[in-house]
Amino acid sequence: MPDSSQVQPAAFNCQGGLVLNRSSFLMEPGQARELENFEPDIQGGYRRISGYSKFINQVVPITSSTAEEPLMSALFANKVLAARGEKIFSSASTELSIRITASTTLSGSGILTVASTSGFSSSGTIQIDSEKFTYTGISTNSFTGVTRATSSTTAALHSKLSVISEDWTVRDTGRTGAKKYHFERFNFDGNEKIILVDQVNAPVVFNSSIAATDVSESSVAGATVVAAYRNHMFYAGKSTIPQEVIFSEPFNEDGFSSGAGAGSVKVDDTVVALKVFRNSLFIFCETRIFKLTGSSLSDFVVEPVTRNIGCINSFTVQEFAGDLIFLGPDGLRTVAATARIGDTELGTISKNIQSIFDENIKDAVEFDSVVIPDKTQYRIFFNKAGQASSISKGATCVLKKEGFEFSELKGLKTTCTDTFVERGDVIVLHGDVTGFVQRQESGSTFDGSTILGKYRSPDMAFGDSGIRKHMQKVIINYRPEGVIDTDLFVRYDNEDKNSARPAVYPFDTTNLPSAYGSALYSTTSSTTQFAYGGGQDPLDRKSVEGSGFSIILRVEDDGVSNPYSLKGFQLEYQLGARR
């Protein structure tokens, strides 16, 4: 039969990200007025972010004061390096390959099967959740001679994929007054190494055996930033020579003889950061940016990129999607090489959320950033003194075909970060104010604390703000990754207090699509029901109430949801009278 209902459909995809610098008349329906703890999804839509969980179960030890925070977390040589106070420590992490019940007996001859034992000592103590184990030997994928519930801990149930980590081992001491670290992984002589600078003490180099050696040259002690370029090590940011960049001899991070190829360059501004990009070393300063090109002392050349724009904080500089991204005084910027060889283009990319940067740049004490390469995503964290983790904020930037899209983060307070790709596995780490090293993109909570996701659409008038729309139905297209428990709100007339405010519409699912061979079996009593052959992007049809001249959709989850993606919406309404 022909449709005589006079219902008007209006469908849109969720795309465009958070937009705070346009009026509702200019915003596209798929853009967002609020997008908190969602991320623009490279597969389309807005995805409620994953959480983070402990990568090392043991807290990084305090060295002298309870006020100490982790100053560094870095992956190197199958170890996690962490700095706190005056010391540098190492640990190792893996995952349990089988489930262990509380009644499983492990009393000196037990075996724990794990993903890998790379980086672990040949014997020692490990921890799963809060239970400690000892072991006397290792093989490629197991700990042997295992005894459980040691050190007065209690045997407990541990699920498959639970994190296993070893106790922290002291690797370097005496780093008096150390501040937040920069580091660089490098290989000058066929051996993998990592160099660390802490803004106060001598740079320190670790080899793959995690043996520490200080750089002996006094002129680079106290360097704040470091970078390997053209087989030289470059040091900068020392408080007594803030405009000088010192570089070592080729292939020798601790050789500084000018006759052997070492030297220095000066710029006319305080150096903030060093970053290699393609064939140049970019020197970010407070109000200027330079780049160094060449291959040796004889032909190194420094030229200005811009004398009007600088970098606010060295920990915001990252290589991202083939560009360099950094925090300037007016928000996020890129340094992008154009088609013309040797030319450089500077672009501001964060105008859509300029108000977020204006609010946080002036108040943040520290900044951190990470790149999640498999999502083409950059995250920046604004860390304010005395602010609780639950209200600490940040932002995401995702590069999509149409351009950059943004969202806001809330509930992550970092003290240091690292991203490392290991055999295709992207590992994103951060240290937090509780003293733990956490792994981002893990789980559905912030280490046990709920994640509150919020989405708000623009005020949608569908081309005519003078016609009343009588809402009939909202159809939600989404992709769940597990059980979700979320609410849909429909509001009218720019959320005017006198407009209709219908009760919330529960938006949840316990029936998940699954493919044979990859899903777990469920029963009629299971909390989650797996439906073979179900669609990955289901439609949830909600009959709704109310009317108004503009319509707003809100989605808010209560913090106990697994991640899910909002793909799009269809609104169905009938036209009413003109105001």
Residue ranges and their predicted role:
Residues 182-217:
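Hydrophobic or amphipathic alpha-helical targeting/insertion segments
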Residues 62-67, 102-109, 116, 209-224, ...:
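Surface-exposed ligand/attachment interfaces on beta-rich extracellular proteins
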Residues 221-252:
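Carboxylate/His-rich catalytic cores and anion/metal-binding grooves
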Residues 281-306:
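Surface-exposed extracellular loop regions of Gram-negative outer-membrane beta-barrel proteins
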Residues 96-110, 115-179:
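Small/polar beta-strand repeat architecture
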Residues 166-170, 210-214, 253-258, 297-302, ...:
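Beta-strand initiation motifs
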Residues 55-64, 168-174, 211-216, 259-264, ...:
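A short beta-strand motif characteristic of beta-propeller blades
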Residues 1-93, 172-192, 308-323, 329-579:
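Beta-sheet repeat architectures centered on beta-propellers
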